[in-house]
């Protein structure tokens, strides 16, 4: 009940501002009042192996909550089994003009067109070095807006090279709808070229550092069955370590007539649940358990978390559900899956 009171106050603010203030508050140490309401519930130990790594539990943060790795320690206190930071790019960039995030409150949805706003990969590395979290940190990487699609692989390779020694796993974001033509990297020759080069770089760095860092590809929920089958074949062919399903959707049809429904950008939250879960089901069949799936999109309850896992996800992630239901949702999910 306490969180829903706080939520009413937060929802009076512009969404991006509310997000910033919430994380800043989380980052303040030694607040006994805050600890009582948010950290009190005991979380069961449920370790699981995925991508060759041991996760404390199946639930992690989705990319976007902590773009620059400034709140790793604070988020870890909430009980997450892993933290995924980013999306970060080789160089800092401001992203798209504000306002660029909008709530669809009646549907528990969020539309965003952030545009990979971040302080760059070097800043993220400094923040990871400063953190005390001993669990798994995934690093989600993307390309700079100024980098052409033809040269985009270079941006991913730069980020992989720099972050390799500091990441538990690396997530390749080629599915954000808010960077022009980025989703084209999911298709044909561009996709094959990307997979070949990042796998080659991974092998080089594995040999150099004697450390294997898994690589996951994050895909769109707006792909057809045929496209998902084709993607699955290439993921298997190039021995990619995992697939993250899914990013936000451009399909706003479920929001017809609602406030903010006409805003451009990717839709996340509850309206994405069915679409992302369906994508997981198709991937699960086409991947034949050769590559694990990390499920994300619309998880707002124990049941929706279970749906992702029953559809084939090994790990799951949340973001919008946390906005609408608060930190206690984390503990409920972990203790019941």
Curated annotation (Swiss-Prot):
Its EC number is 1.3.5.2. Binds 1 FMN per subunit. Keywords: Cell membrane, Flavoprotein, FMN, Membrane, Oxidoreductase, Pyrimidine biosynthesis. The active site is at residue 176. Substrate binds at residues 67, 112-116, 173, 178, 247-248. FMN binds at residues 63-67, 87, 140, 173, 218, 246, 269, 298, 319-320. It is an enzyme of class 1 (oxidoreductase). GO terms for molecular function: dihydroorotate dehydrogenase (quinone) activity. It catalyses: (S)-dihydroorotate + a quinone = orotate + a quinol. One of its GO terms (biological process) is 'de novo' UMP biosynthetic process. One of its GO terms (cellular component) is plasma membrane. InterPro entries: Aldolase_TIM (IPR013785), DHO_dehydrogenase (IPR050074), Dihydroorotate_DH_1_2 (IPR012135), Dihydroorotate_DH_2 (IPR005719), Dihydroorotate_DH_cat (IPR005720), Dihydroorotate_DH_CS (IPR001295). Monomer. Belongs to the dihydroorotate dehydrogenase family. Type 2 subfamily. NCBIfam families: PRK05286.1-1 (NF003644), PRK05286.1-4 (NF003646), PRK05286.2-5 (NF003652), pyrD_sub2 (TIGR01036). This is Dihydroorotate dehydrogenase (quinone). It comes from Buchnera aphidicola subsp. Acyrthosiphon pisum (strain APS) (Acyrthosiphon pisum symbiotic bacterium). The gene is pyrD.
């Amino acid at each position: 009940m306490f969180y829903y009171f706080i939520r009413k106050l937060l929802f009076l603010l512009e969404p991006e501002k509310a997000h910033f203030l919430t994380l800043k508050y989380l980052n303040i140490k030694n607040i006994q009042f805050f600890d009582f309401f948010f950290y009190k519930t005991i979380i069961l130990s449920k370790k699981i192996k995925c991508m060759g790594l041991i996760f404390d539990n199946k639930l992690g943060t989705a990319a976007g909550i902590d773009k620059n790795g400034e709140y790793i320690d604070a988020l870890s206190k909430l009980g997450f089994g892993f933290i995924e930071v980013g999306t970060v790019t080789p160089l800092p960039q401001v992203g798209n003009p504000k306002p660029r995030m909008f709530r669809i409150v009646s549907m528990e949805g969020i539309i965003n067109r952030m545009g990979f706003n971040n302080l760059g990969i070097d800043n993220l590395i400094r923040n990871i070095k400063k953190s005390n979290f001993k669990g798994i940190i995934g690093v989600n990487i993307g390309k700079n807006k100024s980098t052409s699609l033809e040269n985009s692989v270079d941006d991913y390779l730069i980020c992989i090279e720099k972050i390799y020694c500091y990441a538990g796993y690396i997530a390749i974001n080629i599915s954000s709808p808010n960077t022009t033509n980025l989703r084209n990297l999911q298709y044909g020759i561009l996709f094959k070229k990307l997979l070949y080069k990042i796998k080659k770089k991974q092998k080089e760095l594995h040999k150099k550092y004697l450390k294997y860092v898994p690589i996951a590809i994050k895909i769109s929920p707006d792909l057809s069955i045929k496209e998902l089958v084709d993607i699955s074949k290439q993921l298997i062919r190039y021995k990619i370590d995992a697939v993250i399903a899914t990013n936000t959707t451009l399909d706003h049809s479920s929001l017809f007539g609602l406030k903010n429904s006409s805003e451009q950008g990717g839709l996340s939250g509850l309206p994405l649940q069915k679409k992302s879960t369906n994508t997981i089901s198709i991937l699960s069949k086409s991947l034949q358990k050769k590559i694990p799936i990390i499920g994300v999109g619309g998880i707002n309850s124990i049941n929706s978390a279970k749906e992702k896992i029953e559809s084939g996800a090994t790990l799951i992630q949340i973001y919008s559900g946390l906005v609408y239901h608060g930190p206690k949702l984390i503990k409920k999910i972990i203790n019941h899956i």
